[in-house]
Amino acid sequence: MRTLIREHRKELGLTQEELAERVGVTRQTIIALEKGRYSPSLILAHRIARALGREHIEDIFILDEDGAK
């Protein structure tokens, strides 16, 4: 799975720390998510999408063709 967290975060002018605070996670978690090293729970994915002004997690998280992480 790949994410568009970094792109949407920068579009909003947010730092990793600011996004982390909005979502309720550490900056390290945001870094891991942006680098594709961590797959979030469904609840966390929804929190991130909302924090980035998106209604659908599919706007942020993109499943690979084969469904792999």
Swiss-Prot record:
Looking at the UniProt feature table, which residue ranges are given for the DNA-binding region?
16-35
Q: Which PANTHER family match?
A: DNA-BIDING PHAGE PROTEIN (PTHR46558:SF4), TRACRIPTIONAL REGULATORY PROTEIN-RELATED-RELATED (PTHR46558)
UniProt keywords, alphabetically: DNA-binding, Transcription, Transcription regulation
For whether the record's keyword set contains ATP-binding, the answer is no
Protein name listed in UniProt:
Uncharacterized HTH-type transcriptional regulator MTH_1328
One Pfam family linked to the record: HTH_3
This protein's record includes keyword Transcription: yes
Tell me where in this chain the HTH cro/C1-type domain is found: 5-60
Write one Gene Ontology MF term: DNA binding
